[in-house]
From Swiss-Prot:
Glycans are attached at N73. It comes from Ixodes ricinus (Common tick). PROSITE patterns: BPTI_KUNITZ_1, BPTI_KUNITZ_2. It comes from the Eukaryota. The gene is CPI. It is found in: Secreted. Pfam families: Kunitz_BPTI. Gene3D superfamilies: Pancreatic trypsin inhibitor Kunitz domain (4.10.410.10). Residues 1-19 form the signal peptide. GO terms for molecular function: serine-type endopeptidase inhibitor activity; toxin activity. GO terms for cellular component: extracellular space. Salivary gland. This is Kunitz-type anticoagulant protein Ir-CPI.
Length: 86
């Protein structure tokens, strides 16, 4: 029984350490926002980062308001939303 406790504790410690090592990685908060075309009707071709597919996709931006997950071109979207490594 003590052996199982020690092994369980060791596994838990490894998970905690691994989680701590990944702190600071990931994408910027703006890349986690849903696409928002805003209330205007300009229909400007833009790109947003799709969290589910982890790719940049085209959408039509209305030209006003919206949110920060809105990029003029696919290259900027990919560069800004690439997962950051520490």
């Amino acid at each position: 029984m003590p052996f199982i406790f020690v092994v369980s504790f060791a596994i838990l410690a490894c998970i905690v350490v691994d989680t701590a090592n990944h702190k600071g990685r990931g994408r910027p908060a703006k890349c986690k926002l849903p696409p928002d075309d805003g209330p205007c009707r300009a229909r400007i071709p833009s790109y947003y980062f799709d969290r589910k597919t982890k790719t940049c996709k085209e959408f039509m931006y209305g030209g006003c308001e919206g949110n920060e997950n809105n990029f003029e071109n696919i290259t900027t979207c990919q560069e800004e939303c690439r997962a950051k490594k520490v």
